[in-house]
């Protein structure tokens, strides 16, 4: 638009700048057009103007319209009262004939870089929203259940990003209709509202709680899980408190930073510390399971998991280094934080599946640690929680033992006849003598085949230096594949018969009372080992004998019974003249392995539908009254 107003000289740019002051001032030049000049002093910017005719139009006051003839390229600088953040340059049009002249002096145009424009913001919001909804669909379509916090975190992330995408679309459409693009306005429209600030704090807490669930699943040792939970919870709520102060307490804001305040930097460092903590824990787990974590079938899942864990750390560093990246990197961080829990959880499922499949095909089975308690009460306490953590059985309701148990006790349930009647539950508790940190190695025997349903657990051997001398003098009974114990036979000259010296392990005790040999039941049972337990209130060297036990000892010795495989019985006769007669108060029972009972790869017993749970067959002559007499 040209006017007939008098043309001022070319060097009167100060007058041009003065006339351009105003909220709705606009001007046009030969090569491009600015529809509206910035009215906020913080939006001041220099505009490169090539040679040509410059027409200044003031819609509020047409009398102020001026036309300037520029003989050479120039720079238009509004006389703003204050300096501040520069707004992007006006939108040029390549259709103008002097576009090449404008390109020559493009270096004078102080527009924001491309990564600070509206384009990265639009792309990142759209891509992050699509990724979040895909994660949510995968999470709910998965056959295995996912943690509750994980579902809530992904759902909130997907809904929040959808709301932000709608706001960004409306703002970009408004700017397009007015003929300009302003990244600052777009960021302020999305991130300046209370919805974004509140959702950011809530999503931060729930997402990190979902990650904490993943961390707790990775380790089966309860003490390690407790420590990780305490450290992780402390870091999570500290980080949430910092970001709540930055977003909810004015005048602090995440994007309007005060150089004198260290709170934004401290919050970023706290977030970085959380990311490192999560990464280190997952790396330790993946190294311990490297055979399964980085196999050919799981290498793709491992790469995606690493990418999801590293991306938030990279963008946190970028946010600290450069201001403009914070305008769109937050959306990537939101999606990456949600994916870091979902993808790592699925990666763990792949690792556990491969490990279980190999353990079912192997001979040794799975490892059992010191802190794990194997529950043999069937459906009452068996089973696992999450990804393989052993479920700790509580004190059993039907237990009428007159002393209380602790989490360190080993539970052995028996079908010993009690005063309440035949078949009532009876339970022995063997107190753990060694500290919690000592590990337990279970001797495992396989019967007839290498399948996991033939796994039998024997006595526990404690790896302690002070027990080395005891281990050299004692031999732990082993279980052969036919179910019989390999005991040494000695000749008793006085009684003119052979007897077997039953050596006990660290946690077992010998009884001088003649041992009785169980007869296999019709269900195809097999004796897999025997354990002797002292009665409560009696020590190993006690010299007291209950009347019932004395009567049982006076009974005639039965004939040896053949074992399940047709050979001699696993237990022989002990020496009647030995010095161990003071141990007659010790109760002895034999574990009977029934057909259909198996131990799965998690160390939890499983039963077939047509078979009964495993029982403990007592020594004949030992009754519940003996237990009461011994305790009294």
From Swiss-Prot:
Compositionally skewed regions (Gly residues) per UniProt: 380-389
Segments of skewed composition (Low complexity): 546-571
Comp. bias (Basic and acidic residues): 623-632
Positions in the Extracellular compartment: 1-120, 167-189, 250-264, 319-330
Membrane topology: Multi-pass membrane protein
GO-annotated cellular components: plasma membrane
Domain of life: Eukaryota
Principal place of residence: membrane
Keyword Membrane: yes
TM region positions: 121-141, 146-166, 190-210, 229-249, 265-285, 298-318, 331-352
Biased composition (Acidic residues): 482-496
GO biological process: cellular response to pH
Family annotation (InterPro entries): PalH (IPR014844)
Bias (Polar residues): 497-524, 590-601
Keywords, alphabetical: Cell membrane, Membrane, Transmembrane, Transmembrane helix
Family: Belongs to the palH/RIM21 family.
Protein's recorded name: pH-response regulator protein palH/RIM21
């Amino acid at each position: 638009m040209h006017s007939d107003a008098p043309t001022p000289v070319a060097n009167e740019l100060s007058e041009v700048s003065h006339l351009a002051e105003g909220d709705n001032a606009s001007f046009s030049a030969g090569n491009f057009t600015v529809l509206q000049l910035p009215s906020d002093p913080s939006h001041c910017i220099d505009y490169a103007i090539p040679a040509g005719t410059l027409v200044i139009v003031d819609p509020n006051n047409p009398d102020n319209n001026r036309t300037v003839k520029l003989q050479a390229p120039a720079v238009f600088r509004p006389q703003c009262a204050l300096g501040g953040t520069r707004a992007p340059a006006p939108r040029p049009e390549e259709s103008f004939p002097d576009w090449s002249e404008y390109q020559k002096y493009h270096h004078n145009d102080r527009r924001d870089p491309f990564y600070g424009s509206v384009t990265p913001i639009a792309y990142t919001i759209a891509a992050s929203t699509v990724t979040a909804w895909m994660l949510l669909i995968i999470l709910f379509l998965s056959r295995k259940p996912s943690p509750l916090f994980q579902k809530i975190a992904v759902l909130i992330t997907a809904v929040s990003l959808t709301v932000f995408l709608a706001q960004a679309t409306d703002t970009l459409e408004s700017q397009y209709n007015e003929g300009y693009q302003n990244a600052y306005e777009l960021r302020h429209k999305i991130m300046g509202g209370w919805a974004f600030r509140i959702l950011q704090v809530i999503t931060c807490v729930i997402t990190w709680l979902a990650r904490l669930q993943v961390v707790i699943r990775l380790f089966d040792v309860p003490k390690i899980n407790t420590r990780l939970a305490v450290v992780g919870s402390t870091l999570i709520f500290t980080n949430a408190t910092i970001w709540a102060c930055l977003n909810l307490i004015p005048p602090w804001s995440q994007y309007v930073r005060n150089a004198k305040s260290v709170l934004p930097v401290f919050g970023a460092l706290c977030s970085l510390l959380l990311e490192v903590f999560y990464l280190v824990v997952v790396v330790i787990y993946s190294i311990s399971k490297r055979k399964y974590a980085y196999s050919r079938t799981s290498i793709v899942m491992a790469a995606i998991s690493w990418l999801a864990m590293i991306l938030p750390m990279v963008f946190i560093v970028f946010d600290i280094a450069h201001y403009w990246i914070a305008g769109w990197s937050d959306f990537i961080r939101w999606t990456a934080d949600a994916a870091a829990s979902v993808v790592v959880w699925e990666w763990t499922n792949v690792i556990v599946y491969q490990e279980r499949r190999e353990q079912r095909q192997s001979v040794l089975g799975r490892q059992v640690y010191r802190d794990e308690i194997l529950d043999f009460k069937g459906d009452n306490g068996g089973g696992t929680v999450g990804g393989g953590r052993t479920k700790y059985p509580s004190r059993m309701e039907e237990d009428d033992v007159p002393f209380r148990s602790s989490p360190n006790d080993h539970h052995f349930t028996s079908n010993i006849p009690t005063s309440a009647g035949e078949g009532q539950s009876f339970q022995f508790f063997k107190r753990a003598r060694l500290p919690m940190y000592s590990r337990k190695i279970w001797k495992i025997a396989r019967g007839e085949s290498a399948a996991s349903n033939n796994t039998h657990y024997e006595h526990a051997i404690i790896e302690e230096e002070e027990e080395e001398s005891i281990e050299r003098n004692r031999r732990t009974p082993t279980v052969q594949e036919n179910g019989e114990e390999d005991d040494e036979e000695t000749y008793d000259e006085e009684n003119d018969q052979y007897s077997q010296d039953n050596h006990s392990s660290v946690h077992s005790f010998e009884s001088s009372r003649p041992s009785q040999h169980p007869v296999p039941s019709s269900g195809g049972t097999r004796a897999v080992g025997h354990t002797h337990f002292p009665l409560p209130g009696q020590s190993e060297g006690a010299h007291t004998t209950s009347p019932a036990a004395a009567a049982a000892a006076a009974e005639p010795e039965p004939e040896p019974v053949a074992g399940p495989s047709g050979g001699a019985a696993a237990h022989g006769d002990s020496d009647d003249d030995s010095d161990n007669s003071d141990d007659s108060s010790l109760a002895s029972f034999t574990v009977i392995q029934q057909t259909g009972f198996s131990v799965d790869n998690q160390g939890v017993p499983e039963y077939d539908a047509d078979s009964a749970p495993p029982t403990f067959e007592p020594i004949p002559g030992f009754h519940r009254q003996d237990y009461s007499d011994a305790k009294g």
